[in-house]
Amino acid sequence: MRVLGIETSCDETAAAIVQRDDMGEGRILSNVVLSQIAEHEPYGGVVPEIAARAHVEALDRLVDRALNDAGLKLYEVDAVAATAGPGLIGGLIVGLMTAKALAMAAQKPFYAVNHLEGHALTARLTDGLPFPYLLLLVSGGHTQMVLVRGIGDYERLGTTIDDALGEAFDKTAKLLGLPYPGGPAVERMALQGDQKRFALPRPLKGEARLDFSFSGLKTAVRQTATELVPLTDQDVTDICASFQAAVADTLSDRVGRSLERFKTEFPDCATPSLVVAGGVAANKTLRAALENLCTRHGFAFIAPPLNLCTDNAAMIAWAGAERAATQAPDSLDIAPRSRWPLDEKSAPVFGTGRRGAKA
């Protein structure tokens, strides 16, 4: 089965075609991503209206390029899949409406994919990973530990009770006058800094629950920087190094508890695995800390290639292909959802507002 996937949930416009054979093995036939970093850089973050307009301008030609790269015509794909949430509603509408139109025009089945499910299933595309396994999703909008039991069978073990880790990186970078996007900038500066200079907090460290928290760490960075004004270059590098070290310690503690729970629930699992996905997974220091953690706990550490860790359409096409193998297509009446938890049966997370829990 060959599936055309479309991703427009945030600030990347993407189209891809993925093939899944009868044995469940996958192959990427094309994968095209257009980033909007230049459009949003002057504002220091993603502007939803600008993102939606950029998707409108780029998506048609990206779909054409994905088809051309795969050597296919639209009628030769077997299904169309698109991200239906969670994400910025304007971008979701652009991608979803385009995918529906293509599916209708080519008379192909349509699958509305949860963006988080795309991340959750990527390791099955790249590594053929069997169920069950653990997923750590760390990005600008999400920080979650998810137990992946099967297609559509997910349990959120832990989530952030305040800020996503990617947001903490971006806010730290902005506070220190570093360029957008903030994550790579903080990582570069941290390489030159002294991680022991500032004693920053490790939120929730040692607690039994499996959730994450980063707002206190972000506040501590602000207070530290304020006390040092005007900041020298050495101050900035040392703050970045201390911040990154605090994050690595926090993740190791929080994730380690989830690894122990997994071993308790699945004592006979021959190859326990931790999958790390999301843009923050590109950080080499954090990856090294998590890889060492997995080694100590007897887990395989799996991080898909960087271009498949960040937002892309190959993961959406693959999730559509996985669902197509066992489920009926979705209706073309399905609406986008700015908030769409991967495990809707789970209890709401801490700190939910009037509009409900974040995905």
UniProtKB/Swiss-Prot annotation:
InterPro entries tied to this protein: ATPase_NBD, Gcp-like_dom, KAE1/TsaD, TsaD
Keyword Transferase: yes
Binding-site residues for substrate, renumbered to this chain: 137-141, 170, 183, 283
Cofactor list: Fe(2+)
Residues binding Fe cation: 115, 119, 311
Alphabetical keyword list: Acyltransferase, Cytoplasm, Iron, Metal-binding, Transferase, tRNA processing
Record's keyword annotation contains Ligase: no
E.C. designation(s): 2.3.1.234
Family the entry assigns: Belongs to the KAE1 / TsaD family.
Name assigned to this protein: tRNA N6-adenosine threonylcarbamoyltransferase
Upper taxonomic lineage: Bacteria, Pseudomonadati, Pseudomonadota, Alphaproteobacteria, Hyphomicrobiales
